[in-house]
């Protein structure tokens, strides 16, 4: 009888094998799985760094991303101390820094969902300061009610449908609820997102939801459930790299303007804040129609010209020729080529120049610099 109780039911084995629970989450002597989660996160980071990124593919580097934040009553849960809301806000702040470092010509908009309704918190912008200030206005007391996936997707679709065909349109949902209360058929909304080539991804904070899994599968997005705050940061980091562009997307030449950041002395209003005064005395003047903008990259609403800075385009170019993954090798003696630290145990060798680097330098080169000092 004791052996049967330990084995459990037959149908449980299928789920355990599919999720590799027995291999990933192993309890320690005290019955905790924190060490197993930390090891899983570290192994995932190592695997991502050692995986060679595909080359010679079309990438959607002009990204327009709507981030949907679940602000239902489930966000106040203490499952991730101090609360899921605090953990998500901190992770989003870090994600914004990394996102715009990797995607300098991208834009992000914010949507909150509570009381079965979705509201736009921030319109599409490339100004990270505006996005962070908007996040700081949210408090845990703001959370309440239930989550509605359909209303969130419909509002995101309304904000993305007017974007030009050559941009990558994406939705990233952060969901804490275990259910969604929708006014209609959610699968018809998912079909609409698929038809409009809007890539929908989700990060769960509770357990896996079948409808989110089907949404990600239909729209070629990603869906994962966070195990702890560190794992949540890892899941967010997966969305910093630009996705591959669909074959059906437009690939025409784009007319681009390069305005200068200058002090504006004449009295004027900006097209991004038509109802209020400009947020700064400095701004960007559209090179085609002369409209004032507070920040770039942006698409001028007057003449539809794409406005960017030359350094932003240069930084976006690195995704077209990414730094190849280094080969992990066993090292008994020698020094790291970059920081000259003595190597012992493992090293990472560049496939082009055959020079060996330590773990810290390998991480720095692939996540920040994107160039090999030995090859250059």
UniProtKB/Swiss-Prot annotation:
Q: Which cysteines are joined by disulfide bonds?
A: none
Q: Where in the cell is it found?
A: Nucleus
Q: Which Gene Ontology molecular function entries are recorded, alphabetically?
A: zinc ion binding
Q: Which GO terms describe its biological process?
A: DNA-templated transcription; nucleotide-excision repair; regulation of transcription by RNA polymerase II
Q: Which UniProt keywords apply?
A: DNA damage, DNA repair, Metal-binding, Nucleus, Transcription, Transcription regulation, Zinc, Zinc-finger
User: What is stated as this protein's family in its record?
Assistant: Belongs to the GTF2H2 family.
Record's protein name: General transcription factor IIH subunit 2
Organism field: Caenorhabditis elegans
- Which lineage? Eukaryota, Metazoa, Ecdysozoa, Nematoda, Chromadorea
